[in-house]
């Protein structure tokens, strides 16, 4: 009787289980997922994942998985939530933060397109679908490995394009004298141009400090003072003395506070007392002009010789002078005429004008009075 040998496969099984007589078969792999987007089984999720373990998929992969396994290849936001919770129980127990991440990825990722609902806006919520250009964004259907997608080129906005200003084409704001577009076309990157070259050439000069008195005016004032001293030394009745003293109020000395008194229309007595020269009242001088330069009639009036002074005790003093015998009975000086309103005395020692002249002063006193008048 011949012995029979089992087949190689049965022999291998007999070695593993000799007593039972049953062969042990190799374990089979897990059945493929019923989903349509498996693509080889590499990217499919397990049937019964561990609820305590977070799935190893990104939020973009979860959204793409939910959309691909839907019947219409599109889902609303609430439909995506329901699919993720049903597929992965981990997200059902941990609802903190992941729903916001799903919304952000739908809005910011270019692979997802929003499709409005049919029938207007009566029902809330829009559909989300995949961009046909991003169908193969996962390598061989593996949701754990995502390909690097090349983003399509998009032209920059109008205000960033070269050759255009910040406020319009051609840099229109640059010609208005403000911070406009520079040579590179980007107005906000160019250095500000607050002043154009044409404006700088035609700009107004800056205010300068006032200049001091000209040197010529000082020389003329000094020459007039020397001439007045020489005329006073010649004699009190000399016609040149009155002309020189009255001529001190010319344009060179018209800016002084004390020499300007002579250009005003004062009573004859006050003028004669101030000058230290005696004599009868003379005709009042013409009113002063608003401009400082002299005219011909001014020079003729200044050069006219005054009348001869009275002798001592021959006649009563004129009404503006005081005699030693009756100092209290002298008439006060007449007020200045009101024909030139706005004119005021610039001399601070005006009350002493009537006391500066005395008929008993000698020649030296009059010379000293003239010097004190010039030094004021």
Swiss-Prot record:
Ranges of Pro residues composition bias in the record: 304-321
Residues within the DNA-binding region(s): 54-148
Entry-linked SMART domains: FH
Impact when changing residue 104 to R: In BPES; diffuse nuclear localization as wild type; normal transactivation activity
Recorded consequence of changing residue 58 to L: In BPES; sporadic; nuclear and cytoplasmic aggregation; impaired transactivation activity
Glycyl lysine isopeptide (Lys-Gly) (interchain with G-Cter in SUMO) cross-link site: 25
UniProt KW keywords: Differentiation, Disease variant, DNA-binding, Isopeptide bond, Nucleus, Phosphoprotein, Premature ovarian failure, Transcription, Transcription regulation, Ubl conjugation
Segments of skewed composition (Gly residues): 35-44
Entries under Pfam families matching the protein: Forkhead
Stated consequence of mutating residue 105 to S: In BPES; type II
Region (Disordered): 1-53, 276-342
GO CC annotation: chromatin; Flemming body; nucleoplasm; nucleus
Effect listed in the UniProt record for changing residue 109 to K: In BPES; type II; diffuse nuclear localization as wild type; impaired transactivation activity
Induction line: In granulosa-like cells, up-regulated at transcript and protein levels under oxidative stress and heat-shock conditions. Down-regulated by SIRT1.
UniProt-listed InterPro entries: FH_FOXL2, Fork_head_dom, FOX_domain-containing, TF_fork_head_CS_1, TF_fork_head_CS_2, WH-like_DNA-bd_sf, WH_DNA-bd_sf
GO MF term list: cysteine-type endopeptidase regulator activity involved in apoptotic process; DNA binding; DNA-binding transcription activator activity, RNA polymerase II-specific; DNA-binding transcription factor activity; DNA-binding transcription factor activity, RNA polymerase II-specific; nuclear estrogen receptor binding; RNA polymerase II cis-regulatory region sequence-specific DNA binding; sequence-specific double-stranded DNA binding
Biological role: Transcriptional regulator. Critical factor essential for ovary differentiation and maintenance, and repression of the genetic program for somatic testis determination. Prevents trans-differentiation of ovary to testis through transcriptional repression of the Sertoli cell-promoting gene SOX9. Has apoptotic activity in ovarian cells. Suppresses ESR1-mediated transcription of PTGS2/COX2 stimulated by tamoxifen. Is a regulator of CYP19 expression. Participates in SMAD3-dependent transcription of FST via the intronic SMAD-binding element. Is a transcriptional repressor of STAR.
Recorded disease: Blepharophimosis, ptosis, and epicanthus inversus syndrome: A disorder characterized by eyelid dysplasia, small palpebral fissures, drooping eyelids and a skin fold curving in the mediolateral direction, inferior to the inner canthus. In type I BPSE (BPES1) eyelid abnormalities are associated with female infertility. Affected females show an ovarian deficit due to primary amenorrhea or to premature ovarian failure (POF). In type II BPSE (BPES2) affected individuals show only the eyelid defects. Premature ovarian failure 3: An ovarian disorder defined as the cessation of ovarian function under the age of 40 years. It is characterized by oligomenorrhea or amenorrhea, in the presence of elevated levels of serum gonadotropins and low estradiol.
Protein name according to UniProt: Forkhead box protein L2
């Amino acid at each position: 009787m011949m012995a029979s040998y089992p087949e190689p496969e049965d022999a291998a099984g007999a070695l593993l289980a000799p007593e039972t007589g049953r062969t042990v078969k190799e374990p089979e792999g897990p059945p493929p997922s019923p989903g349509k987007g498996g693509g080889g089984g590499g990217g499919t999720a397990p049937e019964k994942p561990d609820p305590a373990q977070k799935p190893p998929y990104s939020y973009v992969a979860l959204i793409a998985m939910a959309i691909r396994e839907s019947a219409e290849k599109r889902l609303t936001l609430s439909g995506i939530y329901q699919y993720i919770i049903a597929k992965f129980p981990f997200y059902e127990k941990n609802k903190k933060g992941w729903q916001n991440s799903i919304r952000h990825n739908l809005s910011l990722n270019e692979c997802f397109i929003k499709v409005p609902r049919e029938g207007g806006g009566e029902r809330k919520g829009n559909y989300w679908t995949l961009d046909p250009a991003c169908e193969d964004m996962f390598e061989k259907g593996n949701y754990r490995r995502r390909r690097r997608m090349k983003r399509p080129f998009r032209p920059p906005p109008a205000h960033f394009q070269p050759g255009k200003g910040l406020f319009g084409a051609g840099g229109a704001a640059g010609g208005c004298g403000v911070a406009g577009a520079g040579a590179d076309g980007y107005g906000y990157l160019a250095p500000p141009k607050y002043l154009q070259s044409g404006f700088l050439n035609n700009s107004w000069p800056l205010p300068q400090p006032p200049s001091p008195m000209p040197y010529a005016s000082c020389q003329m004032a000094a020459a007039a003072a020397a001439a007045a001293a020489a005329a006073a030394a010649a004699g009190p009745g000399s016609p040149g003395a009155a002309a020189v003293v009255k001529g001190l109020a010319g344009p060179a000395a018209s800016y002084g506070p004390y020499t300007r008194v002579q250009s005003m229309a004062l009573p004859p007595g006050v003028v004669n007392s101030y000058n230290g020269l005696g004599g009868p009242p003379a005709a009042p001088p013409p009113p002063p002009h608003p401009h400082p330069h002299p005219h011909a009639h001014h020079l003729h009036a200044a050069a006219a010789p005054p009348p001869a002074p009275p002798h001592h005790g021959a006649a009563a003093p004129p009404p503006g002078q005081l005699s030693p015998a009756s100092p209290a009975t002298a008439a006060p000086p007449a007020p200045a005429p009101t024909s030139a309103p706005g004119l005021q005395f610039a001399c601070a020692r005006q009350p002493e004008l009537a006391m500066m002249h005395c008929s008993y002063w000698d020649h030296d006193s009059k010379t000293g009075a003239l010097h004190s008048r010039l030094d004021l």
